[in-house]
Amino acid sequence: MRDVRVEIMADGASKLFGENKLSRPVESLSEAELYEIAALEEKLRSCVGAKAGPFLAWDSVNRAMIRHWCEAMGDNNPAYSDPAVAAVMGTPAGAVIAPPTMMQAWTMTGFGGQHPPGSDTREQNPAMRHFAEHGYLAVVATNCEQEYAQPICEGDKLSGYSTIEFVSERKTTALGVGYFVTQLTEYRNQHDEVVGTMRFRILKYKPLLPL
């Protein structure tokens, strides 16, 4: 199957986020502020390239969850409900395929915040802890890029492996001063085959107004 790449952009993101690196010129920041920035950025650099995983799915890919997703999204593609149509994609006999955009849903923790036994117990994104320690408490998602390598079939059991791929320089935005963080997650099936990847970008920032 040919790789497919999809980018999902948060509405108005290009308007929200500016290009300036600092909220004030460097020379107007106090020595204490500069020290704090340097300390945070040293911690962030140590996080780039950090890998964690596997993070296992609680459930195998199943038709009920596919149906719920499709109903919520208004997606009536017959390959997601009719095994005969899905068979054209090379699925096992009697199986349907899952919407590729649903890829990340299978390994999410849910409200309990826990992954199944056998999952990596390390932080998926240790940079988040460092941001909180330095007062960058607000977060907004900016965009998501997904690439699909092969169909996700009913009965598959997915796992995710995450890497902090990039942390930007300190930026000034209309929301506040912060950093853009890109996290790359690779999704594999029970045969250790890559089914797709997702790059998820967020802005961690100090809000202009109190939370």
Question: What is each of the regions a protein language model found here?
Answer:
Residues 2-143, 211:
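Hot-dog-fold acyl-thioester-processing enzymes
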Residues 60, 147, 201-203:
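Generic structural detector for well-ordered beta-strands
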Residues 142-189:
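Hydrophobic beta-sheet segments that form the core/acyl-binding groove
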Residues 188-211:
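Surface-exposed, gly/pro-biased binding rims or lids
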Residues 115-116, 122-125, 165, 179-183, ...:
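Short, low-complexity, polar/charged sequence segments that are solvent-exposed and flexible
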Residues 82, 159, 175-177, 198, ...:
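A generic "cationic amphipathic patch" detector
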